[in-house]
């Protein structure tokens, strides 16, 4: 693999790629990141509780396969974005602890991505669950 020198863009050098860890270690690192986020981030705990409630309601209200796919995909997206948001916040905090406008933009933008996904997931959840809930309760 060819890499450009940081000091001289004209200079190209060959570098061997670092040895990659076995796939089991890679999964271990990923799960460690997920569990760290769950244990340290309040919003991730909220997302996990909501996911459990969605699964319970899904079984009670007998969601179709398509509805399950929508629900699983959306709360998977929300949780994945929360992980990315946490990573962005950690990297920004690693780089600087003082107020910087660009650091604020990075953190706020990452948080905004989670918020948009969470709002869309909530709206989709209402569209799926409210009619089924009303039928279940005998209102419709």
Residue ranges and their predicted role:
Residues 92-109:
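Amphipathic, cytosolic membrane-interfacial segments at TM-TM junctions
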